[in-house]
Amino acid sequence: MAVAPNVSDLQSGVVKASQMARAALEHTLQHHQLQDFILAAILASIILLIIRNSMLSPLRGIPGPRLAGLTSLYEFYYDVIKNGTYAHQHPKMHQQYDSTIIRISPNHVHIADPELFAIGPAGSRFRKARYYYNSIGMSTAIGSHYDVEAHHRHRSTMAVGFSTKSLQAFDPIIVNYAREIMDIIASRGLKGTPVVLSHHTQAYTIDVVAKISFGQPVGAMHEVGDHPPTVQAMDCFSNHFNFTKHFPYWQLILPFMPTSAVKRIMPGVHYIKEVGTRLITNLIEQRRIEGRLDEEYQEGKGAIFETLLKPNPKKQYPAPDLNGLVEDACAFLVGGSDTTGLTLQAVTLFVLRNPDVLCALRAELDSASEFIRDSFDIHQVSKLPWLTAVIRETMRLLPPTPGPLPREVPPEGIRVGKYFLPGGNANKGPGRQPGDAEFRPLSPAVCSLYITIPASTQTQKGSSRSVGWEKAVRAWWSGGTHSVVDHARVSDASTSCAYFVFSSSIICGREQHTDERFLACRVAWHELLAFLALLFLRFDLELYESDETNLEWTEHMFTRIRAPVQVRIMKDRWA
């Protein structure tokens, strides 16, 4: 029998339903209001950013792509989405806007004026741009210092490790490792098997740098397989750079992430930091075993990093903690191997693509074989004109650091043509004038060095050699001025603007000696001489699936080429 519903129960149910509906409606309205507020805030921020960068910026009158002046996403597109090709756009922009100065991002200008290369040397008023040099997580390394005084203390403390006496002690290591890597190349190139040259050039430079810096090699020369782990990590390390440059806050997040996640996200950085940590701890442990923990660096006997392990009151240098030492170690390993290894590959390719140069170089090396094959005399080898010519011209054509290498404009600003670049957009209220203790430039303009790879590196379709390379090499060989190539002043300057201590790009363009302003440039120079002299004296080589297109490059702080150079050994003349 059905029971009629109670009227009061029905009324109560209706009231509850209406209350629930009202609450749901209010929640929906509040939610939409919050969304609208967030959206309005984002739109307002974008509008304010556009107004600031387009109408209020002191750089607003400098020519350049309008979108580049409005947002750094323009640079991000070429750096990350287009894989390090923004440096290719800069020469085109200078031509398009017919200007020696262009605006390439909201607070960043690019200058095509060789006279301004004076901003690069040590002691310059133009400090290194922190956003660029510190983005990979090595802010305390010698190549990344923003503070000029801190850099001077760091550099002067290490200088004894690069004295003439110390460097003379390193030469046998450089030569012996070069001989060893030649034997490895010979064993892996048996019966015409292609040799991936980058595996051996980078492994050689990695182990040399590790041995002279920390007293032991990494062991990279003996790694096998299609993807040797240390060489692969070096490639990955620089490939991270363009992303971290735009998102520097990754450094705050990684310490809180599981190691397995860090390995997946930043494999190159993780691997190189592990290697650096191992080398530093092994060096300290070895000194402990030998009872030398309190000893100073012994000039001509010790490893370079022993100069950094103890405070140096005379130099006002406080010894860094383990993290600081590891950052320096990573900078040494990456900067000392990637750059020189690339140059060794490129020289080999260019020489093998130019038979006349190869013939002249081989004749020169044959005539000098008594101080190459038997008892290697690095000083005699350094005087060989053809050998030094092919190295210098290759470095001019393919600098290992092709990017802008930005510097901050000093507080007083500078004038470039009709444009004034301020030292910062500061709030110049009371007590906030330049020179006052409280003065803080909020956003200093960044002045980017114009480092270009000249047009002569580009290959003509169907051409069997680099346009003008042989002619330019002959100009170096003859000892004349480098007038055969356009942009000579720019490219000469570009060979002295790399800041990593072992970089092979710091060899002077015009002189027979290296630039002593840069620590360890002679180490890189001797690595190049030893490796190439032994390679071309010992082996008859041919290129394998390699030509100038292998050297098509992108910029990830260092030069990254399209594909590694491969060679075949046709004959081992010493077998």
From Swiss-Prot:
<keyword id="KW-0503">Monooxygenase</keyword>
<comment type="function">
    <text>Cytochrome P450 monooxygenase; part of the gene cluster that mediates the biosynthesis of oxepinamides, derivatives of anthranilyl-containing tripeptides that share an oxepin ring and a fused pyrimidinone moiety. The nonribosomal peptide synthetase (NRPS) opaA assembles the quinazolinone core with D-Phe incorporation. The first adenylation domain (A1) of opaA loads and activates anthranilic acid whereas the second A domain (A2) is for activating of L-Phe, which is then converted to D-form by the E domain.</text>
</comment>
<feature type="glycosylation site" description="N-linked (GlcNAc...) asparagine">
    <location>
        <position position="242"/>
    </location>
</feature>
<dbReference type="GO" id="GO:0016020">
    <property type="term" value="C:membrane"/>
</dbReference>
<feature type="glycosylation site" description="N-linked (GlcNAc...) asparagine">
    <location>
        <position position="83"/>
    </location>
</feature>
<keyword id="KW-0812">Transmembrane</keyword>
<feature type="glycosylation site" description="N-linked (GlcNAc...) asparagine">
    <location>
        <position position="6"/>
    </location>
</feature>
<keyword id="KW-0408">Iron</keyword>
<keyword id="KW-0479">Metal-binding</keyword>
<dbReference type="Pfam" id="PF00067">
    <property type="entry name" value="p450"/>
</dbReference>
<dbReference type="InterPro" id="IPR050121">
    <property type="entry name" value="Cytochrome_P450_monoxygenase"/>
</dbReference>
<dbReference type="GO" id="GO:0020037">
    <property type="term" value="F:heme binding"/>
</dbReference>
<protein>
    <recommendedName>
        <fullName>Cytochrome P450 monooxygenase opaB</fullName>
        <ecNumber>1.-.-.-</ecNumber>
    </recommendedName>
</protein>
<dbReference type="InterPro" id="IPR001128">
    <property type="entry name" value="Cyt_P450"/>
</dbReference>
<keyword id="KW-0472">Membrane</keyword>
<feature type="binding site" description="axial binding residue">
    <location>
        <position position="521"/>
    </location>
    <ligand>
        <name>heme</name>
    </ligand>
</feature>
<keyword id="KW-0349">Heme</keyword>
<keyword id="KW-1133">Transmembrane helix</keyword>
<dbReference type="GO" id="GO:0004497">
    <property type="term" value="F:monooxygenase activity"/>
</dbReference>
<comment type="pathway">
    <text>Secondary metabolite biosynthesis.</text>
</comment>
<dbReference type="GO" id="GO:0016705">
    <property type="term" value="F:oxidoreductase activity, acting on paired donors, with incorporation or reduction of molecular oxygen"/>
</dbReference>
<feature type="transmembrane region" description="Helical">
    <location>
        <begin position="37"/>
        <end position="57"/>
    </location>
</feature>
<dbReference type="GO" id="GO:0005506">
    <property type="term" value="F:iron ion binding"/>
</dbReference>
<keyword id="KW-0325">Glycoprotein</keyword>
<keyword id="KW-0560">Oxidoreductase</keyword>
<dbReference type="GO" id="GO:0044550">
    <property type="term" value="P:secondary metabolite biosynthetic process"/>
</dbReference>
<comment type="similarity">
    <text>Belongs to the cytochrome P450 family.</text>
</comment>
<dbReference type="InterPro" id="IPR036396">
    <property type="entry name" value="Cyt_P450_sf"/>
</dbReference>
